[in-house]
Amino acid sequence: VRKHNGSKEMIAAALLHDVVEDTDVTIDEIRQEFGNAVANLVDDLTDVSKPADGNRATRKAMDRDHTAQASAAAMVIKAADLINNTESITEHDPKFAKVYLKEKRALLDVMFKIKHMDIWKEADSQL
């Protein structure tokens, strides 16, 4: 995110983007601690699906729809995360990478607000 001239709020949100999904921390707690701008970005970045919502394809479609409504700043962070995760998963779990890369291609395709940006092109080149 820093490489692509992200703001301090974007960098903070990039560091916090999995906190709500992976811990008991809430968006409201992030808002209290880091302010509205960071909390809104983290909210845009947090997957909305839950295991009870259906199979993986159904959940990923829900999360894609959520991402499609996100701000351009959140999409930049999401693209940076996609780049980082793609490198790691391709190297460490080639079998899962086949599924993962298809999901991320579909995700990147809904991130039209940043399609003109270098970070989108970098993510696109990895898929």
Label for each model-derived stretch:
Residues 1-127:
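Active-site helical microenvironments for divalent-metal-assisted chemistry
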